[in-house]
Amino acid sequence: LDSKLRGTVVLNIGKTPGAGLAFYNRLQNTLSLTRVVARPDSMEAIRKRLLGSQRVIVVVTSDDYKKYKTMLDSLPADLPVIYVFLMPLKSMLDMEGYWKKAAAVVLGHTDESVIQEYVADVLVGKAVADGRLSVAVADLFKPGDGVTITPKVSRIYRPEDYGMDSKIL
């Protein structure tokens, strides 16, 4: 994430007001942020707050996100929205349309504090993304897609990892 961009809003969607707080606190060390906790009774106020931002990071820690789908649909296409899912992938497979429109999608698979902090570090370049998907993500990615990083070992890239044929190159 570009640390020079001001006006970033983190929208936390979870079962409790503290959902996603470890992510926000870690990210706040590097970026200028505002945090908004999603509540079904304040949809219009939340939407207006998001429209006034330069970038939105939607942090989802429970299936409560389904209550907010209409509001998320109403965000302008030119507003960069990053989705951070801190819950099992299989519980959010109906989010395909959002993934396709997103500036970025990060799958953390759990809302444990240590994972929230690690994901925040990945977004600001303080940590590397590591791992492969265990399940398909709609028609965007298949199981096994991703990168596995072994510490202290140089990365070896093969054209086949990126859909190219090394025999042709």
List where the protein language model places each region.
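Short proline/glycine- and basic residue-enriched helix-capping loop/turn segments at helix->loop/beta transitions
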Residues: 167-169
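Preference for extracellular/luminal or secreted protein segments
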Residues: 1-165
